[in-house]
Protein backbone atom coordinates (compact mmCIF):
# COMPACT_ATOMS: atom_id res chain seq x y z
CA UNK A 1 0.00 0.00 0.00
CA UNK A 2 1.05 3.60 -0.59
CA UNK A 3 1.13 6.11 2.25
CA UNK A 4 -2.20 7.52 1.08
CA UNK A 5 -3.73 4.03 1.04
CA UNK A 6 -2.41 3.27 4.54
CA UNK A 7 -3.89 6.49 5.89
CA UNK A 8 -7.21 5.66 4.23
CA UNK A 9 -7.18 2.18 5.81
CA UNK A 10 -6.35 3.67 9.21
CA UNK A 11 -9.19 6.19 8.91
CA UNK A 12 -11.63 3.40 8.12
CA UNK A 13 -10.42 1.45 11.17
CA UNK A 14 -10.77 4.59 13.31
CA UNK A 15 -14.41 4.91 12.26
CA UNK A 16 -15.03 1.28 13.24
CA UNK A 17 -13.62 1.88 16.74
CA UNK A 18 -15.18 5.31 17.32
CA UNK A 19 -11.87 7.18 17.37
CA UNK A 20 -11.80 10.67 15.83
CA UNK A 21 -8.07 11.38 16.10
CA UNK A 22 -5.26 8.84 16.35
CA UNK A 23 -1.80 9.62 17.69
CA UNK A 24 1.22 7.62 16.49
CA UNK A 25 4.46 8.42 18.34
CA UNK A 26 7.90 7.08 17.50
CA UNK A 27 8.28 5.18 20.77
CA UNK A 28 8.27 1.49 21.52
CA UNK A 29 6.87 0.13 24.81
CA UNK A 30 9.99 1.36 26.64
CA UNK A 31 10.34 4.98 25.50
CA UNK A 32 13.43 4.14 23.44
CA UNK A 33 14.88 6.79 21.14
CA UNK A 34 15.53 4.24 18.40
CA UNK A 35 13.10 1.36 18.04
CA UNK A 36 13.03 -2.12 16.58
CA UNK A 37 11.33 -2.85 13.27
CA UNK A 38 8.18 -4.16 15.00
CA UNK A 39 7.54 -0.75 16.56
CA UNK A 40 7.95 1.48 13.48
CA UNK A 41 4.23 2.25 13.07
CA UNK A 42 4.81 5.95 12.47
CA UNK A 43 7.24 5.18 9.66
CA UNK A 44 4.81 2.65 8.17
CA UNK A 45 1.88 5.07 8.15
CA UNK A 46 3.69 8.26 7.04
CA UNK A 47 6.81 7.16 5.16
CA UNK A 48 8.95 9.50 7.30
CA UNK A 49 12.08 7.64 8.42
CA UNK A 50 13.57 10.13 10.93
CA UNK A 51 14.23 9.00 14.50
CA UNK A 52 11.96 11.63 16.08
CA UNK A 53 8.42 12.64 15.22
CA UNK A 54 4.75 12.16 16.03
CA UNK A 55 1.94 11.60 13.55
CA UNK A 56 -1.69 12.63 14.06
CA UNK A 57 -4.39 11.23 11.81
CA UNK A 58 -7.94 12.62 11.68
CA UNK A 59 -10.66 12.13 9.08
CA UNK A 60 -9.95 15.51 7.48
CA UNK A 61 -6.23 16.00 8.18
CA UNK A 62 -2.94 14.20 8.66
CA UNK A 63 0.03 15.87 10.32
CA UNK A 64 3.59 15.11 11.37
CA UNK A 65 5.47 17.02 14.07
CA UNK A 66 9.28 16.82 14.09
CA UNK A 67 12.23 18.92 15.21
CA UNK A 68 14.83 21.03 13.40
CA UNK A 69 17.13 18.09 12.68
CA UNK A 70 14.57 16.68 10.26
CA UNK A 71 12.81 19.67 8.64
CA UNK A 72 14.45 19.17 5.24
CA UNK A 73 14.24 15.38 5.30
CA UNK A 74 10.59 15.36 6.41
CA UNK A 75 9.57 17.90 3.77
CA UNK A 76 11.10 15.67 1.10
CA UNK A 77 9.62 12.41 2.37
CA UNK A 78 6.11 13.78 3.01
CA UNK A 79 5.79 15.42 -0.40
CA UNK A 80 2.70 14.12 -2.20
CA UNK A 81 1.35 12.17 0.78
CA UNK A 82 -1.19 14.75 1.93
CA UNK A 83 0.51 14.90 5.33
CA UNK A 84 1.18 18.40 6.68
CA UNK A 85 4.61 19.01 8.24
CA UNK A 86 4.54 20.90 11.53
CA UNK A 87 8.02 22.29 12.24
CA UNK A 88 8.39 22.13 16.01
CA UNK A 89 9.73 25.26 17.65
CA UNK A 90 9.16 27.51 14.65
CA UNK A 91 7.13 30.75 15.01
CA UNK A 92 3.35 30.37 14.56
CA UNK A 93 3.61 26.56 14.48
CA UNK A 94 1.30 24.99 17.09
CA UNK A 95 2.58 22.20 19.28
CA UNK A 96 0.72 18.95 18.95
CA UNK A 97 -0.98 19.68 22.30
CA UNK A 98 -2.09 23.12 21.10
CA UNK A 99 -3.41 21.59 17.88
CA UNK A 100 -5.39 18.92 19.76
CA UNK A 101 -6.77 21.47 22.21
CA UNK A 102 -8.02 23.65 19.36
CA UNK A 103 -9.35 20.96 17.03
CA UNK A 104 -10.85 18.29 19.31
CA UNK A 105 -14.25 19.25 20.69
CA UNK A 106 -17.02 17.94 22.96
CA UNK A 107 -17.79 14.27 22.44
CA UNK A 108 -14.74 13.47 20.31
CA UNK A 109 -12.26 10.70 21.12
CA UNK A 110 -8.44 10.70 20.90
CA UNK A 111 -6.86 7.28 20.54
CA UNK A 112 -3.34 5.87 20.87
CA UNK A 113 -1.62 2.67 21.90
CA UNK A 114 -1.05 3.27 25.61
CA UNK A 115 2.09 1.13 25.54
CA UNK A 116 3.80 3.69 23.27
CA UNK A 117 2.93 6.84 25.26
CA UNK A 118 4.47 7.62 28.63
CA UNK A 119 2.25 7.84 31.69
CA UNK A 120 3.19 11.50 32.13
CA UNK A 121 2.28 12.38 28.56
CA UNK A 122 -1.03 10.51 28.82
CA UNK A 123 -1.92 12.30 32.06
CA UNK A 124 -1.19 15.68 30.46
CA UNK A 125 -3.32 14.83 27.43
CA UNK A 126 -6.17 13.58 29.60
CA UNK A 127 -6.15 16.70 31.78
CA UNK A 128 -5.98 19.06 28.81
CA UNK A 129 -8.65 17.35 26.71
CA UNK A 130 -11.01 16.72 29.61
CA UNK A 131 -11.65 20.47 29.62
CA UNK A 132 -12.94 20.08 26.05
CA UNK A 133 -15.10 17.07 26.87
CA UNK A 134 -12.80 14.80 24.84
CA UNK A 135 -12.29 11.17 25.88
CA UNK A 136 -9.20 8.95 25.49
CA UNK A 137 -9.05 5.43 24.07
CA UNK A 138 -5.66 3.89 24.83
CA UNK A 139 -6.10 0.15 24.32
CA UNK A 140 -5.94 0.00 20.53
CA UNK A 141 -2.92 -0.49 18.27
CA UNK A 142 -4.84 0.66 15.20
CA UNK A 143 -1.76 1.29 13.05
CA UNK A 144 -0.45 -2.16 13.90
CA UNK A 145 -3.81 -3.73 13.07
CA UNK A 146 -3.61 -2.59 9.43
CA UNK A 147 0.12 -3.27 9.04
CA UNK A 148 0.48 -6.06 6.51
CA UNK A 149 3.43 -8.41 7.11
CA UNK A 150 4.45 -6.61 10.29
CA UNK A 151 7.88 -7.76 11.55
CA UNK A 152 7.93 -9.93 14.67
CA UNK A 153 9.31 -8.76 18.02
CA UNK A 154 13.08 -9.08 18.12
CA UNK A 155 14.61 -11.86 20.23
CA UNK A 156 18.39 -11.63 19.87
CA UNK A 157 20.74 -13.63 22.14
CA UNK A 158 21.55 -12.12 25.53
CA UNK A 159 25.15 -12.03 26.76
CA UNK A 160 26.72 -11.10 30.08
CA UNK A 161 29.05 -8.11 30.34
CA UNK A 162 32.12 -9.26 32.24
CA UNK A 163 33.22 -7.18 35.21
CA UNK A 164 36.48 -6.33 33.42
CA UNK A 165 34.33 -4.30 31.03
CA UNK A 166 31.61 -3.18 33.46
CA UNK A 167 33.85 -2.28 36.40
CA UNK A 168 31.13 -3.21 38.91
CA UNK A 169 29.33 -6.48 39.54
CA UNK A 170 25.60 -6.98 39.07
CA UNK A 171 25.24 -7.76 42.78
CA UNK A 172 26.97 -4.53 43.79
CA UNK A 173 24.86 -2.47 41.40
CA UNK A 174 21.64 -4.02 42.71
CA UNK A 175 22.75 -3.41 46.29
CA UNK A 176 23.38 0.26 45.43
CA UNK A 177 19.92 0.62 43.91
CA UNK A 178 18.27 -1.09 46.87
CA UNK A 179 19.97 1.39 49.21
CA UNK A 180 18.59 4.20 47.05
CA UNK A 181 15.12 2.60 47.24
CA UNK A 182 15.41 2.50 51.02
CA UNK A 183 16.30 6.19 51.16
CA UNK A 184 13.24 6.98 49.06
CA UNK A 185 10.99 4.77 51.18
CA UNK A 186 10.12 2.59 48.18
CA UNK A 187 9.04 -1.05 48.41
CA UNK A 188 9.15 -1.70 44.66
CA UNK A 189 11.08 -0.15 41.78
CA UNK A 190 9.62 -0.49 38.27
CA UNK A 191 12.21 -0.09 35.51
CA UNK A 192 11.28 -0.24 31.83
CA UNK A 193 14.06 1.73 30.08
CA UNK A 194 16.07 -0.85 28.15
CA UNK A 195 19.50 0.70 28.63
CA UNK A 196 18.92 1.06 32.38
CA UNK A 197 18.00 -2.61 32.67
CA UNK A 198 21.03 -3.68 30.63
CA UNK A 199 23.32 -1.49 32.76
CA UNK A 200 21.89 -2.73 36.07
CA UNK A 201 22.07 -6.43 35.20
CA UNK A 202 25.34 -6.27 33.21
CA UNK A 203 23.66 -7.86 30.20
CA UNK A 204 23.69 -6.87 26.55
CA UNK A 205 21.56 -7.91 23.59
CA UNK A 206 20.67 -6.77 20.10
CA UNK A 207 16.94 -6.11 20.03
CA UNK A 208 17.31 -2.61 18.58
CA UNK A 209 19.49 -1.94 15.56
CA UNK A 210 22.85 -0.56 16.74
CA UNK A 211 21.67 -0.58 20.38
CA UNK A 212 22.86 -3.62 22.40
CA UNK A 213 19.77 -3.84 24.61
CA UNK A 214 17.26 -6.55 25.54
CA UNK A 215 13.48 -6.11 25.21
CA UNK A 216 12.52 -6.37 28.87
CA UNK A 217 10.87 -4.90 31.94
CA UNK A 218 12.17 -5.16 35.51
CA UNK A 219 10.62 -4.95 38.97
CA UNK A 220 12.92 -4.84 42.00
CA UNK A 221 11.77 -5.42 45.57
CA UNK A 222 13.79 -5.63 48.77
CA UNK A 223 14.20 -9.39 48.29
CA UNK A 224 13.78 -10.25 44.60
CA UNK A 225 14.21 -8.98 41.06
CA UNK A 226 11.74 -9.96 38.36
CA UNK A 227 12.95 -9.66 34.77
CA UNK A 228 10.23 -9.84 32.11
CA UNK A 229 11.73 -10.92 28.78
CA UNK A 230 11.62 -13.63 26.12
CA UNK A 231 13.22 -16.75 27.61
CA UNK A 232 14.36 -17.89 24.15
CA UNK A 233 16.95 -15.09 24.13
CA UNK A 234 18.77 -16.49 27.19
CA UNK A 235 21.31 -19.32 27.22
CA UNK A 236 21.27 -21.58 30.28
CA UNK A 237 24.53 -20.20 31.68
CA UNK A 238 23.22 -16.61 31.53
CA UNK A 239 19.96 -17.62 33.24
CA UNK A 240 21.87 -19.45 35.98
CA UNK A 241 24.15 -16.46 36.57
CA UNK A 242 21.13 -14.16 36.83
CA UNK A 243 19.35 -16.52 39.23
CA UNK A 244 22.48 -16.66 41.40
CA UNK A 245 22.08 -12.90 41.91
CA UNK A 246 18.37 -13.19 42.65
CA UNK A 247 17.05 -12.32 39.18
CA UNK A 248 14.10 -14.49 38.09
CA UNK A 249 12.83 -14.51 34.49
CA UNK A 250 9.14 -14.15 33.56
CA UNK A 251 7.39 -13.85 30.16
CA UNK A 252 7.81 -10.44 28.50
CA UNK A 253 4.14 -9.37 28.44
CA UNK A 254 3.23 -10.82 31.84
CA UNK A 255 4.28 -7.63 33.64
CA UNK A 256 0.95 -6.03 32.71
CA UNK A 257 -0.88 -8.60 34.83
CA UNK A 258 1.79 -8.72 37.54
CA UNK A 259 1.53 -5.01 38.39
CA UNK A 260 -2.19 -5.49 39.06
CA UNK A 261 -1.18 -7.52 42.14
CA UNK A 262 0.67 -4.64 43.84
CA UNK A 263 -0.70 -4.13 47.37
CA UNK A 264 -2.19 -0.83 48.51
CA UNK A 265 0.19 -0.49 51.45
CA UNK A 266 3.24 -0.61 49.15
CA UNK A 267 5.11 2.34 47.69
CA UNK A 268 6.10 1.92 44.04
CA UNK A 269 8.91 4.06 42.65
CA UNK A 270 8.87 4.65 38.90
CA UNK A 271 9.45 7.44 36.41
CA UNK A 272 6.23 8.44 34.66
CA UNK A 273 8.27 10.09 31.91
CA UNK A 274 9.73 6.66 31.09
CA UNK A 275 7.09 4.05 32.01
CA UNK A 276 4.23 3.66 29.54
CA UNK A 277 0.71 4.70 30.42
CA UNK A 278 -0.92 1.29 30.06
CA UNK A 279 1.51 -0.23 32.56
CA UNK A 280 0.92 2.52 35.11
CA UNK A 281 -2.85 2.39 34.62
CA UNK A 282 -2.75 -1.33 35.50
CA UNK A 283 -1.28 -0.57 38.94
CA UNK A 284 -4.12 -0.54 41.52
CA UNK A 285 -5.39 2.98 42.16
CA UNK A 286 -4.84 2.70 45.92
CA UNK A 287 -1.14 1.87 45.51
CA UNK A 288 1.08 4.88 46.23
CA UNK A 289 3.30 5.79 43.29
CA UNK A 290 6.53 7.72 43.87
CA UNK A 291 7.11 9.47 40.55
CA UNK A 292 10.86 10.10 40.37
CA UNK A 293 13.76 9.74 37.97
CA UNK A 294 15.04 6.21 37.52
CA UNK A 295 17.40 5.36 40.37
CA UNK A 296 19.79 3.98 37.75
CA UNK A 297 20.01 7.21 35.73
CA UNK A 298 22.94 8.94 37.44
CA UNK A 299 24.97 5.83 38.33
CA UNK A 300 24.75 4.75 34.68
CA UNK A 301 25.74 8.19 33.36
CA UNK A 302 28.74 8.67 35.68
CA UNK A 303 31.14 6.06 34.35
CA UNK A 304 33.37 4.32 36.88
CA UNK A 305 37.20 4.40 36.52
CA UNK A 306 37.28 1.01 34.77
CA UNK A 307 34.71 2.16 32.21
CA UNK A 308 36.56 5.44 31.59
CA UNK A 309 39.89 3.69 31.04
CA UNK A 310 38.21 1.19 28.72
CA UNK A 311 36.63 4.08 26.80
CA UNK A 312 40.08 5.60 26.25
CA UNK A 313 41.16 2.32 24.66
CA UNK A 314 38.01 2.14 22.51
CA UNK A 315 38.55 5.68 21.25
CA UNK A 316 42.16 5.04 20.28
CA UNK A 317 41.09 2.00 18.26
CA UNK A 318 38.21 3.93 16.74
CA UNK A 319 40.52 6.87 16.07
CA UNK A 320 42.86 4.61 14.14
CA UNK A 321 39.98 3.35 11.99
CA UNK A 322 38.60 6.83 11.24
CA UNK A 323 42.08 8.26 10.57
CA UNK A 324 42.77 5.45 8.09
CA UNK A 325 39.42 6.23 6.47
CA UNK A 326 40.19 9.94 6.08
CA UNK A 327 43.60 9.15 4.57
CA UNK A 328 41.99 6.66 2.17
CA UNK A 329 39.38 9.23 1.11
CA UNK A 330 41.93 11.98 0.53
CA UNK A 331 44.12 9.63 -1.47
CA UNK A 332 41.41 8.11 -3.65
CA UNK A 333 38.67 10.70 -4.26
CA UNK A 334 38.62 11.53 -7.95
CA UNK A 335 40.80 8.51 -8.73
CA UNK A 336 38.37 5.66 -8.06
CA UNK A 337 34.55 5.71 -7.89
CA UNK A 338 33.40 6.48 -4.32
CA UNK A 339 29.84 7.24 -3.26
CA UNK A 340 28.30 8.09 0.10
CA UNK A 341 27.21 4.49 0.59
CA UNK A 342 30.48 2.92 -0.52
CA UNK A 343 32.38 5.32 1.74
CA UNK A 344 30.24 4.16 4.68
CA UNK A 345 31.03 0.54 3.80
CA UNK A 346 34.75 1.33 3.66
CA UNK A 347 34.67 2.98 7.09
CA UNK A 348 32.88 -0.08 8.51
CA UNK A 349 35.64 -2.20 6.99
CA UNK A 350 38.32 -0.13 8.77
CA UNK A 351 36.44 -0.39 12.08
CA UNK A 352 35.98 -4.14 11.64
CA UNK A 353 39.75 -4.55 11.53
CA UNK A 354 40.05 -3.14 15.05
CA UNK A 355 40.30 -5.43 18.06
CA UNK A 356 37.06 -5.93 20.03
CA UNK A 357 34.89 -4.06 17.48
CA UNK A 358 31.25 -5.21 17.67
CA UNK A 359 29.08 -3.01 15.44
CA UNK A 360 28.22 0.55 14.46
CA UNK A 361 26.74 2.54 17.34
CA UNK A 362 24.25 4.12 14.91
CA UNK A 363 23.66 4.17 11.18
CA UNK A 364 26.49 6.23 9.68
CA UNK A 365 25.78 9.70 8.37
CA UNK A 366 27.99 10.11 5.31
CA UNK A 367 26.75 13.30 3.68
CA UNK A 368 28.44 14.97 0.71
CA UNK A 369 27.94 18.54 -0.46
CA UNK A 370 24.40 19.83 -0.02
CA UNK A 371 23.35 16.58 1.67
CA UNK A 372 25.46 17.64 4.67
CA UNK A 373 23.00 20.51 5.24
CA UNK A 374 20.47 17.84 6.28
CA UNK A 375 21.50 17.37 9.91
CA UNK A 376 20.64 13.66 10.16
CA UNK A 377 20.86 12.66 6.50
CA UNK A 378 21.12 8.95 5.76
CA UNK A 379 22.16 7.90 2.28
CA UNK A 380 19.90 5.44 0.48
CA UNK A 381 20.28 3.86 -2.96
CA UNK A 382 17.86 6.55 -4.19
CA UNK A 383 19.79 9.50 -2.70
CA UNK A 384 23.35 8.16 -2.94
CA UNK A 385 25.71 10.44 -4.87
CA UNK A 386 29.35 10.16 -5.97
CA UNK A 387 32.08 11.99 -4.06
CA UNK A 388 34.16 14.47 -6.01
CA UNK A 389 37.47 16.24 -5.26
CA UNK A 390 35.72 19.42 -4.12
CA UNK A 391 33.56 20.64 -1.25
CA UNK A 392 32.91 19.02 2.13
CA UNK A 393 32.05 15.50 3.23
CA UNK A 394 30.41 15.29 6.66
CA UNK A 395 30.99 11.92 8.36
CA UNK A 396 29.09 11.39 11.63
CA UNK A 397 29.69 7.81 12.70
CA UNK A 398 30.42 5.64 15.72
CA UNK A 399 31.21 2.16 16.91
CA UNK A 400 30.54 -0.25 19.73
CA UNK A 401 33.58 -1.99 21.17
CA UNK A 402 33.85 -4.27 24.19
CA UNK A 403 35.61 -1.29 25.76
CA UNK A 404 32.76 1.14 25.10
CA UNK A 405 30.88 3.28 22.60
CA UNK A 406 32.17 5.99 20.26
CA UNK A 407 30.55 8.84 18.32
CA UNK A 408 32.62 11.14 16.12
CA UNK A 409 31.97 13.68 13.39
CA UNK A 410 34.58 15.02 11.03
CA UNK A 411 33.99 17.41 8.16
CA UNK A 412 36.49 16.38 5.49
CA UNK A 413 37.67 18.83 2.84
CA UNK A 414 37.53 16.84 -0.40
CA UNK A 415 39.12 19.52 -2.57
CA UNK A 416 39.39 23.29 -2.96
CA UNK A 417 37.08 25.09 -0.50
CA UNK A 418 35.84 28.69 -0.77
CA UNK A 419 36.89 31.35 1.72
CA UNK A 420 33.31 31.45 3.03
CA UNK A 421 33.26 27.69 3.59
CA UNK A 422 36.57 27.92 5.45
CA UNK A 423 35.29 30.80 7.55
CA UNK A 424 32.39 28.72 8.85
CA UNK A 425 34.55 25.59 9.14
CA UNK A 426 36.92 27.53 11.40
CA UNK A 427 34.14 29.13 13.46
CA UNK A 428 32.58 25.76 14.24
CA UNK A 429 35.98 24.30 15.14
CA UNK A 430 36.67 27.19 17.50
CA UNK A 431 33.42 26.34 19.30
CA UNK A 432 34.41 22.68 19.65
CA UNK A 433 37.81 23.60 21.07
CA UNK A 434 36.52 26.26 23.46
CA UNK A 435 33.88 24.00 25.00
CA UNK A 436 36.37 21.17 25.32
CA UNK A 437 38.78 23.46 27.20
CA UNK A 438 36.17 24.68 29.70
CA UNK A 439 37.08 24.83 33.39
CA UNK A 440 34.10 25.30 35.67
CA UNK A 441 32.84 24.87 39.21
CA UNK A 442 31.01 21.69 40.13
CA UNK A 443 27.30 22.42 39.98
CA UNK A 444 27.36 23.73 36.43
CA UNK A 445 25.09 22.15 33.85
CA UNK A 446 25.39 21.99 30.09
CA UNK A 447 23.22 25.10 29.87
CA UNK A 448 25.92 27.10 31.68
CA UNK A 449 28.60 26.04 29.19
CA UNK A 450 26.77 25.82 25.87
CA UNK A 451 27.59 29.40 24.85
CA UNK A 452 31.28 28.46 24.62
CA UNK A 453 30.47 26.30 21.60
CA UNK A 454 27.99 28.68 19.95
CA UNK A 455 29.74 32.01 20.57
CA UNK A 456 31.84 32.05 17.36
CA UNK A 457 28.68 31.52 15.30
CA UNK A 458 26.53 33.86 17.39
CA UNK A 459 29.08 36.61 16.80
CA UNK A 460 28.34 36.13 13.08
CA UNK A 461 24.57 36.13 13.61
CA UNK A 462 24.43 32.39 12.90
CA UNK A 463 23.39 29.29 14.86
CA UNK A 464 22.53 25.60 14.51
CA UNK A 465 19.20 23.91 15.29
CA UNK A 466 20.32 21.02 17.44
CA UNK A 467 21.82 20.48 20.86
CA UNK A 468 25.55 20.97 21.21
CA UNK A 469 26.06 17.69 23.01
CA UNK A 470 24.48 14.55 24.44
CA UNK A 471 25.53 11.91 26.92
CA UNK A 472 26.87 8.61 25.59
CA UNK A 473 26.36 5.17 27.11
CA UNK A 474 28.96 2.50 27.85
CA UNK A 475 28.38 -0.17 25.22
CA UNK A 476 24.79 1.04 25.29
CA UNK A 477 22.80 3.83 23.66
CA UNK A 478 24.85 6.40 21.80
CA UNK A 479 22.39 9.03 23.10
CA UNK A 480 22.11 8.86 26.88
CA UNK A 481 20.87 11.26 29.54
CA UNK A 482 20.80 13.20 31.69
CA UNK A 483 23.95 15.16 30.71
CA UNK A 484 23.82 17.40 27.65
CA UNK A 485 24.83 20.77 26.23
CA UNK A 486 22.08 23.11 25.06
CA UNK A 487 21.21 26.77 25.56
CA UNK A 488 17.48 26.31 26.13
CA UNK A 489 16.36 25.63 29.67
CA UNK A 490 14.13 22.56 29.72
CA UNK A 491 12.38 21.60 32.99
CA UNK A 492 14.04 18.50 34.40
CA UNK A 493 16.62 18.43 31.63
CA UNK A 494 19.49 20.34 33.16
CA UNK A 495 21.66 17.80 34.95
CA UNK A 496 24.79 18.80 36.83
CA UNK A 497 27.95 17.64 35.04
CA UNK A 498 29.50 14.93 37.21
CA UNK A 499 32.85 13.16 37.19
CA UNK A 500 32.80 10.27 34.72
CA UNK A 501 30.01 11.58 32.51
CA UNK A 502 30.82 11.24 28.81
CA UNK A 503 29.27 13.93 26.62
CA UNK A 504 29.59 14.88 22.96
CA UNK A 505 30.85 18.30 21.88
CA UNK A 506 29.42 18.88 18.41
CA UNK A 507 28.55 22.37 17.18
CA UNK A 508 27.70 22.72 13.51
CA UNK A 509 26.66 25.03 10.71
CA UNK A 510 24.23 24.17 7.90
CA UNK A 511 23.31 26.06 4.76
CA UNK A 512 20.33 24.54 2.98
CA UNK A 513 21.21 23.35 -0.54
CA UNK A 514 24.78 24.46 0.11
CA UNK A 515 26.96 22.66 2.63
CA UNK A 516 27.07 21.38 6.19
CA UNK A 517 29.79 21.39 8.84
CA UNK A 518 29.98 19.58 12.17
CA UNK A 519 33.00 18.81 14.36
CA UNK A 520 32.36 16.29 17.15
CA UNK A 521 34.52 14.89 19.91
CA UNK A 522 33.43 12.88 22.92
CA UNK A 523 34.83 14.03 26.24
CA UNK A 524 34.79 12.81 29.82
CA UNK A 525 34.14 15.11 32.76
CA UNK A 526 36.95 15.10 35.34
CA UNK A 527 37.80 16.75 38.62
CA UNK A 528 40.36 19.56 38.42
CA UNK A 529 41.71 21.51 41.41
CA UNK A 530 39.76 22.18 44.59
CA UNK A 531 40.04 25.65 46.16
CA UNK A 532 38.22 27.74 48.72
CA UNK A 533 35.64 28.39 45.99
CA UNK A 534 34.83 24.73 45.57
CA UNK A 535 35.59 21.79 43.29
CA UNK A 536 36.59 22.79 39.77
CA UNK A 537 35.87 20.47 36.85
CA UNK A 538 37.26 20.07 33.34
CA UNK A 539 36.98 17.84 30.27
CA UNK A 540 39.30 15.37 28.59
CA UNK A 541 38.81 14.69 24.89
CA UNK A 542 38.44 10.95 24.31
CA UNK A 543 38.10 11.15 20.52
CA UNK A 544 41.50 10.99 18.79
CA UNK A 545 41.15 11.94 15.11
CA UNK A 546 42.64 14.99 13.34
CA UNK A 547 40.49 17.93 12.33
CA UNK A 548 41.01 18.74 8.66
CA UNK A 549 43.52 21.59 8.50
CA UNK A 550 42.61 22.15 4.83
CA UNK A 551 39.47 23.89 6.11
CA UNK A 552 41.11 25.96 8.85
CA UNK A 553 41.97 29.67 8.59
CA UNK A 554 44.54 30.18 11.41
CA UNK A 555 44.18 33.97 11.21
CA UNK A 556 40.55 33.64 12.37
CA UNK A 557 41.65 31.85 15.54
CA UNK A 558 43.07 33.32 18.73
CA UNK A 559 46.52 32.27 19.93
CA UNK A 560 44.82 30.22 22.66
CA UNK A 561 42.60 28.44 20.14
CA UNK A 562 45.56 27.63 17.89
CA UNK A 563 47.44 26.26 20.89
CA UNK A 564 44.44 24.13 21.85
CA UNK A 565 44.30 22.68 18.34
CA UNK A 566 48.05 22.10 18.17
CA UNK A 567 48.10 20.38 21.57
CA UNK A 568 45.18 18.17 20.59
CA UNK A 569 46.80 17.23 17.29
CA UNK A 570 50.04 16.35 19.08
CA UNK A 571 48.04 13.91 21.24
CA UNK A 572 46.35 12.46 18.16
CA UNK A 573 49.69 11.78 16.47
CA UNK A 574 51.21 10.26 19.61
CA UNK A 575 48.28 7.89 20.25
CA UNK A 576 47.20 6.99 16.71
CA UNK A 577 50.44 6.79 14.70
CA UNK A 578 51.49 3.41 16.21
CA UNK A 579 48.41 1.85 14.57
CA UNK A 580 49.21 3.14 11.06
CA UNK A 581 51.44 1.98 8.23
CA UNK A 582 54.32 4.20 7.07
CA UNK A 583 52.31 6.00 4.36
CA UNK A 584 49.45 6.72 6.72
CA UNK A 585 51.87 7.81 9.44
CA UNK A 586 53.56 10.32 7.13
CA UNK A 587 50.19 11.70 6.12
CA UNK A 588 49.07 11.98 9.77
CA UNK A 589 52.27 13.83 10.65
CA UNK A 590 51.34 16.53 8.13
CA UNK A 591 47.63 16.41 9.06
CA UNK A 592 48.52 17.18 12.70
CA UNK A 593 51.22 19.79 12.02
CA UNK A 594 51.31 22.87 14.22
CA UNK A 595 49.64 25.97 12.77
Across the structure, where does each feature detected by a protein language model lie?
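Active-site neighborhoods and metal-handling regions in enzymes and metal-associated proteins
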Residues: 1-595
